[in-house]
């Protein structure tokens, strides 16, 4: 076994002699480098990805969107067509009539067919200082009399 002891001593000596050399020349501190980005693995990405909603959740979300859109659409439609003015039980609005003939005029016109034209001519003659300005009304009155056989 002397052989093993020799080798042991000889082996131990060289490392001891090397140690002082290393201490004499200290190494500079290593510069910190950012770690290289590891490519994403298939196992890690599935755990980090958010969970997607199921089919029923998507259908419920779509139905809610349709309901809101329908409500907004109906409200705007009623606003445009006058739904805010009183609801569906209210009477429909009557159009404004700009001209209505008096009810008593019809029998009077049957008795005197050119009464309206006469009134127009007389009103013009009273309001105008010059009768020549009322020639148009006079001409209409003459045409009415000819058409009704009164001339």
UniProtKB/Swiss-Prot annotation:
Its main location: nucleus. Residues 111-151 form the CHCH domain. It comes from the Eukaryota. Induction: Up-regulated by hypoxia (4% oxygen) (at protein level). Pfam families: CHCH (PF06747). A motif (Cx9C motif 2) lies at residues 134-144. It is found in: Nucleus; Mitochondrion; Mitochondrion intermembrane space. This is Coiled-coil-helix-coiled-coil-helix domain-containing protein 2. The lineage of its organism: Eukaryota, Metazoa, Chordata, Craniata, Vertebrata.
């Amino acid at each position: 076994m002397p052989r093993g002891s020799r080798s042991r001593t000889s082996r131990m000596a060289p490392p001891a002699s090397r140690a002082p050399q290393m201490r004499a020349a200290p190494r500079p501190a290593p510069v910190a480098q950012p770690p290289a980005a590891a490519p994403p693995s298939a196992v890690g990405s599935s755990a980090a990805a958010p969970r997607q909603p199921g089919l029923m959740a998507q259908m419920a979300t779509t139905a809610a969107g349709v309901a809101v859109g329908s409500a907004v659409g109906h409200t705007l439609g009623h606003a445009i067509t006058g739904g805010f003015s009183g609801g569906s039980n209210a009477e429909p609005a009557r159009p404004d009539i700009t001209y209505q003939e008096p009810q008593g005029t019809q029998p009077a016109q049957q008795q005197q067919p050119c009464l309206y034209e006469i009134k127009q001519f007389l009103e013009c003659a009273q309001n105008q200082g010059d009768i020549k300005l009322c020639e148009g009304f006079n001409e209409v009155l003459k045409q009415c009399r000819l058409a009704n056989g009164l001339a």
